Amino acid sequence: MIRQRFSIACPAILVGVTVAAVIGTTGDMMAQVLKDVQTPDTPLVLKAQGSFFVGGEKVEQTQGELGNLGPGGHIAVNQMYVRYMVPQGGDGNLPVVMVHGATLTGKSWETTPDGRMGWDEYFVRKGHPVYIPDQVGRGRSGFNQAVFNNVRAGSTPPANQPVWLRFSDEGAWPNFRFGPQAGAAYPDNQFPVSAVDELAKQGVPDVSFGGVPTPNPTLKALSDLASQLNGAVLMGHSQSGSFPLEAALINPAATKGLVLVEPGSCPARYTPEQIATLAKVPILVVFGDHRDTATGIPTLPSWQNRFEACQALIGRIRSAGGQADMLNPPDRGIRGNSHMIMQDKNNLQIADLILQWIDEQVSKRKAAK
């Protein structure tokens, strides 16, 4: 067991949930309406907000690759869209970059499926500028359509097409650990399963496997973004959980802290030299509850196995003199958190634990230097 290096007193939260859900049927979904979105009592005061792109390259494509919408010519590909909010009075606080997981977009960090405040706004209210990218090939970052149009034109074999990934509602329940099977929530489950249809609406086609170059351009874009911000805390989730590590290896000076939320992997392949580089940056790994739930995806390791792989990585980094911690809410009596921990009913309680870690292990360390 990896010992904790920081302590926060938090009361246990045990929430019983009874769910009557019909999963896997076609037809209209339960619609969220504007009145379901909760408005905080205090205003959100911003110094700035906006959006921009990081990276990208200009390529020339044929008329057919462009879908026959006018002549061939040049377009931009592999750019990363970023939306940001900067709080009034937050000067000097470290920016936080939040990266979404597979088949999702930056929406993961915004208003929760049941209409509560998301981590993007909450971190801003706590004084941190927040930057929310859409991974290259996803959402407003777009994808390179030429690989599909070439197949349609017969110039590329169909087998060369990227795989389009999506999670079904049925698959999300065990893999995201809302319950052991669709419609059967754990008694202490923290995810708002009554709004699970709203989570389904957040899903988008994902061409990460074969639809983006190798290495994934998002990795360098994150490193470049952190550099443009003169240093930032990088936070990844699920598929992107290891992205902050990879960005830190590109430019450790720009990554002031790394937060890995339920990472899909904590790679064991890192060399001693890479571990020494990662040991220069404070790292926090965050996992939820019920990790022994069968994911329903035999080709992937269980969440408990991933948890143990992250413990092993933490051990290697500490042995190299680094600061690395595991935030495991069940150790603190906080039960029932899901894979979508940033959307759980106690999401702000978990956010406070992360914010305290950033303050103690990143901001104060930066100030001391």
At which residue positions do the language-model features occur?
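Gly/Ala-rich beta-loop-alpha elbow adjacent to hydrolase catalytic centers
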Residues: 235-244
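Conserved alpha/beta-hydrolase
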Residues: 116-141
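Short beta-strand element of the alpha/beta-hydrolase
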Residues: 92-101
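The feature captures the conserved acid-bearing segment of alpha/beta-hydrolase catalytic domains
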Residues: 260-329
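Conserved alpha/beta-hydrolase fold motif
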Residues: 234-235, 258
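N-terminal cap/lid segment of alpha/beta-hydrolase-fold proteins
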Residues: 33-91
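Catalytic active-site module of serine/aspartate enzymes centered on a nucleophile-bearing elbow/loop
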Residues: 340-369
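Conserved acidic catalytic loop of the alpha/beta-hydrolase fold
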Residues: 215-233
